[in-house]
């Protein structure tokens, strides 16, 4: 900074001024010396840099930086970018101009930019953060040139050459013209200064890659679409087209049919004439600029045109979208969703446009003012509730006073309200009136409730224009203007008609109501998602379409074993989509213990308040009601006849059923939907009333992906910095208190939705919402720490370093998901992925390869199993104790990112009949909800022993085995059985005790023997894995230690050896410390000083060598001399015999049986015994199975 600046008064230094300016783009290749140039008009420069003297503004000796955000194209420009002011243009088009000349970041748009305004803010150089890492993609030839250069040289070239024009400031997405490169990523902020400490990483661009610019993709798409009407453009007679401007009443040269789509949000139109400011914005229609020449008649932006639709017509104003945009398609006219609903247009509708006279006049020149308008409420739970009445009538009044509404008979008028605020004001008003107890003549002292704040709208009240009176001559479109000063508004009754559907119009999003998950969008992108929603919608639409023919008395039960799965969200979404009148009742609010009649009266009162005034109607346009009873198991609970109060519970359930049946019989335009979280607690009599039951499950990976998309897009699509300064308004920034909650978020491009969905297995949508909130807090905390380290305020760091957005990085979500798992694992049963890697396991390479073949194939190539091929998902580990069976199962879960369930035998046992089997079912159901998942049955022989050998009176173990077999069959059934992505791993020391049915193909069909390491190399690998995190001395030779160990050492023995060695090292180190302290104390005592404590020595005198625990060879030798093997040689021989029986015994027995049959014998089995067996069975047999599981064939003559 020049010294002249430092001499200015302190309160005038580093002011940051923002304003709205005009923007101009010049893309002229002939201006070869001017590229990446930003010019400001002289007046604008002086305004945003008030601290700069006239001399500084003339010579521009000092770098000046500004933040610029282009307005009107949020698809491409939604954050502020840092630019260096190159020069001042004294001959700018306006005094408030920003001029971009051949800027590399804008060249991809060519000359298709129709932006005309931007927000510009001056910033000080000290506010710009430094970039630590910069990732730049360059072409192969540039990469080859720069690859062999030292990093210091490359960094100097970037600062002094490549980024010279931008003042060494660069950001993500910027184009570096000198090397034809693009900045792919910058850390820790999205834009900043490249310094001598910045780590620059070059990425070689792959030729013919598909990573094209979005705008180019849109151009290609538009070109393909426009080919359909290419012929009409070729045959367009230019002379006829121009002459039509002289004869405006003549028909269009050619009538172009346009598709219709709803506007996603209310579009603001800049620079409207003052006379148009009161126009009805619902009659503003929009199209892409390229559509205007194709209409066949001269029309300009903002002209009035005649819209032809469904053999009817109306007058609207036509505007064009600001370019560039990628949200709006060609050959499409975008209308307000309210206008679409009033015109009853669908996705298949097509409209045409015609010219009219006085096209640049306001609507008041075309439509007469209505003398009186009759408005009725449309029946809904909002309009029929008295507590909201004052609020929505006040909002209706505001709607008609804000603009001159243009309406037709039958039009819908929506009014949004804040229900919480409305109820609060209603209760407050009643309380004030009760306290004052107004007497006649004291009404003037009553509180004035005429002006009601808007709040945060969360519901909509619909009104309908029932009748309009006024002069209708020369009004072919039957449109009238409601002028509050001239039109009499009459409120008349309630209309029991169907609400406007939301499936095509999307009026719910347009009115900015609280976002609701869009199931249709998710199902369209992935048809296998949310099958229960498709089933539910099918039932509802069938009932809706058949009500005029037959009363189906539809009742639906939504059941789930877990809360927060989206039952209520689905009901609300489908009701809004189809235009149904939803009556939502929480059964917790209806319960009055000991007062059945009061409960029934409360239920009927809430329903009759909404539908009691309506007569039963089978008209398809009449309102259709949905009664939704949440938590029905609390109102109609299952009772045990032996419990106290069982008769009262049963009586209440019967009365509720009777009441619901009466409504179903009286109203054919009504259905009842109930939800419960525990089907076993629901009264059996009520279950007999239910016709359809839909079961909800925890979202699978694809469904979680769609939920994450919705939640993240909802945060990133919020309006940001909508409070932009007005033109010529100079606003001083960074002065007010900063509220970080008003800042919007953005997702960095390396955050993968698929990865988030995979990591969040087993979590509900409610849990995913908490993850988003946690990720927001983590991102803010990360930026606060960065701001403190950079000595920059948080507000400046967010606006300058991140363009006014808080950018999520992958670490935010990774930590949020891990925290969610750790925090909610006990409450929601979310399983955790253990942290055991392959490196922690040694000496099991062959077993590891077998596991990779069994599990890796179904996970990476599920399409191979889609044609009915059964996958092998069951693995059984057996062998001596301490050989790593449990550890290997955990490593499987970690390596493949699978969730992990560990099941012990006693956990399944329960004293009540049937509960033990239910526990087995719950374990597998939790695994299905958390898939991809591994279920690990430790000590499987205690869970599933041979049936018939147990002496328990109830046969519990036999039933557990049978249930386990049934569940295992479901696991191997693929996606249809719900076992897709679930793997079952068992571990046992005694496979000979297992039930034989467990070992057949399709269950535990992959048996892997985990034995003891029989070579020194394998034992040394185990030691390497166990000591991976140890600090070993140089004299430690693990191979030498392994040679000193016998071949009866198991993995557990080696673990004990390493643990004892570490303990020995710690003891030895502690003794050495004690000796040092003792010696020091002796010296201090001899000097007459006070002895020191151990704690003081560690805090003040200890060195790092004193604290480090270094394991020596002597520690291993000492531990080895004290350790005895846990498995004897005789026991190992037994396990080898068991292995021989399971892996080689059957094949050997079959071979021996074949040989014996050829010799006419029966392998030593008496002939009389075989005949006796055949008599008992009643049929011939081909052999028997001995006690070891060997199949022995009978002789050929039997």
UniProtKB/Swiss-Prot annotation:
Q: Which gene encodes it?
A: PEX6
Does the entry feature the keyword ATP-binding, yes or no?
Answer: yes
Q: Which GO terms describe its biological process?
A: protein import into peroxisome matrix, receptor recycling; protein unfolding
Q: One GO molecular function term?
A: ATP hydrolysis activity
- Catalysed reactions, as listed in the record: ATP + H2O = ADP + phosphate + H(+)
Q: Which Pfam families match?
A: AAA, PEX6_4th
Q: What class of enzyme is it?
A: hydrolase
Checking Gene3D superfamilies in the record gives: 1.10.8.60, P-loop containing nucleotide triphosphate hydrolases
Q: Which family does it belong to?
A: Belongs to the AAA ATPase family.
User: Which domain of life does the protein's organism represent?
Assistant: Eukaryota
- Keywords, sorted A to Z: ATP-binding, Cytoplasm, Hydrolase, Membrane, Nucleotide-binding, Peroxisome, Peroxisome biogenesis
The UniProt record gives the binding positions of ATP as 879-886
Q: Spell out the protein name for this chain.
A: Peroxisomal ATPase PEX6
Q: How does it sit in the membrane?
A: Peripheral membrane protein
Primary localisation category: cytoplasm
Localization: Cytoplasm, Cytosol; Peroxisome membrane
Tell me the function of this protein: Component of the PEX1-PEX6 AAA ATPase complex, a protein dislocase complex that mediates the ATP-dependent extraction of the PEX5 receptor from peroxisomal membranes, an essential step for PEX5 recycling. Specifically recognizes PEX5 monoubiquitinated at 'Cys-6', and pulls it out of the peroxisome lumen through the PEX2-PEX10-PEX12 retrotranslocation channel. Extraction by the PEX1-PEX6 AAA ATPase complex is accompanied by unfolding of the TPR repeats and release of bound cargo from PEX5.
Q: Matching InterPro entries, A to Z?
A: AAA+_ATPase (IPR003593), AAA_ATPase_domain (IPR050168), ATPase_AAA_core (IPR003959), ATPase_AAA_CS (IPR003960), P-loop_NTPase (IPR027417), PEX6_4th_dom (IPR056995), RecA-like_PEX6_r2 (IPR047533)
Query: Recorded E.C. number(s)?
Result: 3.6.4.-
Assembly and oligomerization: Interacts with PEX1; forming the PEX1-PEX6 AAA ATPase complex, which is composed of a heterohexamer formed by a trimer of PEX1-PEX6 dimers.
Cellular compartments per GO CC: ATPase complex; cytosol; peroxisomal membrane; transporter complex
């Amino acid at each position: 900074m020049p010294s002249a600046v430092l001499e200015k008064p302190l309160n005038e230094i580093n002011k940051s001024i923002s304003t709205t300016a005009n923007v101009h783009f010049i893309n002229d290749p002939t201006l070869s010396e001017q590229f990446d140039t930003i010019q400001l008009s002289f007046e604008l420069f002086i305004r945003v840099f008030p601290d700069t003297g006239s001399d500084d503004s003339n010579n521009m000796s000092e770098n000046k930086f500004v933040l610029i955000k282009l307005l009107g194209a949020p698809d491409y420009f939604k954050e502020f970018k840092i630019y260096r002011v190159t020069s001042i243009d004294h001959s700018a088009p306006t005094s408030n101009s920003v001029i971009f000349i051949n800027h590399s970041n804008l060249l991809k748009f060519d000359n298709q930019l129709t932006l005309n305004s931007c927000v510009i803010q001056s910033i000080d150089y000290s506010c710009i953060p430094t970039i630590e890492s910069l990732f730049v993609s360059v072409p192969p030839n540039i990469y080859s040139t720069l690859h062999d250069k030292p990093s210091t040289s490359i960094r100097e070239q970037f600062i002094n050459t490549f980024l010279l024009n931008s003042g060494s400031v660069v950001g993500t997405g910027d184009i570096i013209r000198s090397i034809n490169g693009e900045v792919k990523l910058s850390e820790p902020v999205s834009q900043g200064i490249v310094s001598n400490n910045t780590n620059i990483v070059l990425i070689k661009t792959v030729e013919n890659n598909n990573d094209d610019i979005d705008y180019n993709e849109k151009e290609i798409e538009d070109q393909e679409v426009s080919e359909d009407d290419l012929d009409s453009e070729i045959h367009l007679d230019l002379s006829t087209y121009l002459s039509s401007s002289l004869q405006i009443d003549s028909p269009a040269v050619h009538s172009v049919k346009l598709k219709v789509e709803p506007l996603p949000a209310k579009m603001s139109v800049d620079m409207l004439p003052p006379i148009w400011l009161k126009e009805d914005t619902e009659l503003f229609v929009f199209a892409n600029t390229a559509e205007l020449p194709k209409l066949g008649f001269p029309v300009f932006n903002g002209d009035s045109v005649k819209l032809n639709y469904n053999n009817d017509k109306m007058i609207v104003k036509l505007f064009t979208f600001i370019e560039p945009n990628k949200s709006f398609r060609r050959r499409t006219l975008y209308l307000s969703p309210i206008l679409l609903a009033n015109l009853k247009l669908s996705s298949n509708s097509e409209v045409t446009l015609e010219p009219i006279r006085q096209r640049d006049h306001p609507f008041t020149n075309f439509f007469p003012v209505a003398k009186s308008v009759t408005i009725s409420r449309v029946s809904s739970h909002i309009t029929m509730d008295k507590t909201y009445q004052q609020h929505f009538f006040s909002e209706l009044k505001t709607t008609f006073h804000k603009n001159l509404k243009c309406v037709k008979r039958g039009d819908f008028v929506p009014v949004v309200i804040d229900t919480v605020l409305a109820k609060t004001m209603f209760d407050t008003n009643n309380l004030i009136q009760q306290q004052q107890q107004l007497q006649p003549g004291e009404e003037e002292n009553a509180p004035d409730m005429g002006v009601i704040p808007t709040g945060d709208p969360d519901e909509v009240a619909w009104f309908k224009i029932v009748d309009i009176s006024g002069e209708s001559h020369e009004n072919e479109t039957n449109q009238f203007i409601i002028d509050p000063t001239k039109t009499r508004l009459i409120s008349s009754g309630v209309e029991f008609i169907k609400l406007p559907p939301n499936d095509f119009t999307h009026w719910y999003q347009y009115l900015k109501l609280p976002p609701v998950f869009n199931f249709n969008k998710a199902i369209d992108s992935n048809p296998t998602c949310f099958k229960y929603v498709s089933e539910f919608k099918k039932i509802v639409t069938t009932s809706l379409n058949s009500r005029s023919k037959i009363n189906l008395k539809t009742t639906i039960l939504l059941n789930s074993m877990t809360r927060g799965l989206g039952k209520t969200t689905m009901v609300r979404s489908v009701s809004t989509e189809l235009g149904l009148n939803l009556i939502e009742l929480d059964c917790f609010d209806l319960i009055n213990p000991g007062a059945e009649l009061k409960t029934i009266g409360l239920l009927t009162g809430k329903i009759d308040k909404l539908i009691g005034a309506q007569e039963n109607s089978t008209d398809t346009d009449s309102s259709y009601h949905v009664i939704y009873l949440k938590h029905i198991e609390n109102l109609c609970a299952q009772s045990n006849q032996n419990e106290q109060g069982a008769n009262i519970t049963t009586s209440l359930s019967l009365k509720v059923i009777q009441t619901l049946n009466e409504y179903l019989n009286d109203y054919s335009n009504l259905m009842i939907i109930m939800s419960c979280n525990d089907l076993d607690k629901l009264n059996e009599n009520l279950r007999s009333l239910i016709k359809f039951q839909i079961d909800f499950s925890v979202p699978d990976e694809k469904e979680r992906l769609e939920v994450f998309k919705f939640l993240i897009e909802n945060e990133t699509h919020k309006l940001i910095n909508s409070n932009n300064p007005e033109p010529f308004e100079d606003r001083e920034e960074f002065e007010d208190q900063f509220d970080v909650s008003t800042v919007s978020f953005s997702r960095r491009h390396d955050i993968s939705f698929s990865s988030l969905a995979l990591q969040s297995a087993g979590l509900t949508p409610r849990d995913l919402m908490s993850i988003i909130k946690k990720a927001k807090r983590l991102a803010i905390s990360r930026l606060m720490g960065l701001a403190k380290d950079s000595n920059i305020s948080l507000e400046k760091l967010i606006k300058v370093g991140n363009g006014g957005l808080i950018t999520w990085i992958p670490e935010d979500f990774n930590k949020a998901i891990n925290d969610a798992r750790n925090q909610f694992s006990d409450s929601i049963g979310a399983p955790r992925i253990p942290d055991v890697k392959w490196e922690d396991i040694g000496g099991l390479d062959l077993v590891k390869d077998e596991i990779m073949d069994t599990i890796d194939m179904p996970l990476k190539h599920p399409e191979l199993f889609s044609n009915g091929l059964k996958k092998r998902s069951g693995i059984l580990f057996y062998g001596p104790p301490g050989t790593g069976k449990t550890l290997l199962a955990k490593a499987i879960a970690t390596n493949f990112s699978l969730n992990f369930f560990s099941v012990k035998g006693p956990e399944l046992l329960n004293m009540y009949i049937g509960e033990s089997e239910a526990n087995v079912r719950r374990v597998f159901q939790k695994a299905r909800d958390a898939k991809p998942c591994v279920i690990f049955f430790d000590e499987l022989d205690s869970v599933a022993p041979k049936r018939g050998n147990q002496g328990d009176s109830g046969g519990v173990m036999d039933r557990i085995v049978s249930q386990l077999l049934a569940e295992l069959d479901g696991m191997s059934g693929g996606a249809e059985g719900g076992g897709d992505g679930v793997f079952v791993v068992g571990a046992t020391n005694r496979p000979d005790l297992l039930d034989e049915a467990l070992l057949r193909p399709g269950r535990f069909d992959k048996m892997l023997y985990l034995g003891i390491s029989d070579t020194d190399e394998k034992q040394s690998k185990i030691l390497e894995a166990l000591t991976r995190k140890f600090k070993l001395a140089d004299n430690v030779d693990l191979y030498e230690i392994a040679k000193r160990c016998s071949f009866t050492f198991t993995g557990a023995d080696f673990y004990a050896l390493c643990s004892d060695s570490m303990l020995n090292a710690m003891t030895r180190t502690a003794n050495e410390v004690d000796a040092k302290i003792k010696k020091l104390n002796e010296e201090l005592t001899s000097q007459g000083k006070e002895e020191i404590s151990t704690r003081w020595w560690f805090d003040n005198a200890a060195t790092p060598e004193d604290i480090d625990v270094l394991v020596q060879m002597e520690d291993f030798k000492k531990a080895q001399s004290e350790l005895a093997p846990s498995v004897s040689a005789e026991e190992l021989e037994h396990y080898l015999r068991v292995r021989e029986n399971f892996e080689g015994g059957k094949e050997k027995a079959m071979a021996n049986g074949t040989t014996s049959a050829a010799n006419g014998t029966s392998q030593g089995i008496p002939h009389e015994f075989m005949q006796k067996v055949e008599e008992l069975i009643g049929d011939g047999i081909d052999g028997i199975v001995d006690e070891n599981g060997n199949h022995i064939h009978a002789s050929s003559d039997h």
